[in-house]
Swiss-Prot record:
GO cellular component: a single term: host cell cytoplasm
Compartment annotation: Host cytoplasm
Functional summary from the UniProt entry: Transports viral genome to neighboring plant cells directly through plasmosdesmata, without any budding. The movement protein allows efficient cell to cell propagation, by bypassing the host cell wall barrier. Increases plasmodesma size exclusion limit. Acts as a suppressor of RNA-mediated gene silencing, also known as post-transcriptional gene silencing (PTGS), a mechanism of plant viral defense that limits the accumulation of viral RNAs.
Family: Belongs to the Tymovirales TGBp1 protein family.
Protein name: Movement and silencing protein TGBp1
(+)RNA virus helicase ATP-binding domain segment(s): 1-138
Domain (+)RNA virus helicase C-terminal stretches: 139-226
Length: 226
């Protein structure tokens, strides 16, 4: 665990008041904070770590084990579970849990370490996220593009994400391919369009909206409300 704690401190994670002798070790980071990248580096440098995820696993590589789906843990290895908030029943075998608590706050635990800074989210999108009440900031040098209009007031570009059932029905009726926020956890796209039948004032503080807008690393379009 000492190696992991040293790594977290070097990456700018802050400590909470929760004692380190309480287990498992819980680490929280906002979307785009480099959580998965840090875990991959840990795997590459130390063979005694195993990292599983409830999100999207790494592709098979001949050079590294990568982040895998939950499975057998080599005896003696320090086991880490990423995206732990996606399932409350898969935590017992792990000594450390990582997640973005905003993606599933109802299943989040009190953390030992946290990081509120994203390195991916463009500044305009980050400002909108923060204005909706999330503790969120960005170090990205990209301003990005943010456009907010009614649901029928602009084109649907890039990866289209529907965040309510009415939006899903509307998109299906018009033959538009879309995904739900839960289908793109841990992924990122250069262009994202978020579609909702409700206006931004109603959806801004929702987990689904947060999950959707943090998938964008460039151009962000919000088509919401009438």
């Amino acid at each position: 665990m000492d190696i992991l704690i040293i790594s977290l401190k070097s990456l700018g994670y802050s400590r909470t008041a929760r004692p380190l002798d309480s287990s498992p070790l819980v680490v929280h980071a906002v979307a785009g904070a480099g959580k998965s990248t840090a875990l991959r580096k840990l795997l590459a440098r130390h063979s005694t770590f195993t990292v599983h995820t409830l999100g999207v696993p790494d592709k098979i590589s001949i050079r590294t084990r990568g982040i895998q789906k939950p499975g057998p843990i080599p005896e003696g290895n320090f086991a880490i579970l990423d995206e732990y908030t996606l399932d409350a029943t898969t935590r017992e075998a792990y000594q450390a849990l990582f997640a973005d608590p905003y993606q599933a706050p109802e299943l989040s635990l009190e953390p030992h370490f946290y990081l509120e800074t994203s390195f991916r989210t463009p500044t305009k999108a980050a400002a909108l996220i923060a204005s909706c009440g999330f503790d969120f900031e960005t170090n990205s040098q990209e301003e990005g593009h943010l456009e907010i209009t009614g649901i029928f007031k602009g084109p649907l570009l890039g990866k289209v994400i529907a965040i309510d059932s009415e939006a899903e029905t509307t998109l299906s009726r018009h033959g538009v391919e879309f995904v739900k926020p839960c289908q793109v956890t841990g992924l990122e796209f250069p262009v994202v369009t978020i579609v909702s039948a409700a206006p931004i004032e109603e959806i801004g503080q929702s987990t689904l909206f947060y999950n959707a807008i943090t998938r964008s690393k460039g151009l962000t379009y919000v088509r919401a409300g009438a």
